């Protein structure tokens, strides 16, 4: 899976040392994804975290208890999930 981090309606993904999966490559052609270094201390600045992968498709992270992070919105998740769902027919 790949991670998307949302801040001020902009989508970010870690810049370095990440395997770019098939689902991520597909979404990258459809939406604007900014690449930047993301540190654990920065996580609290994001309103949404989205997992994208071949197995589950597009999934919103609701919380990360260990660092006390909680999702604040579903706006971008709904947009990304809609793009993924309408283009990927599940059999």
Placement of each model-derived feature along the sequence:
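Helix-start/capping segments and mature chain N-termini
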Residues: 1-91
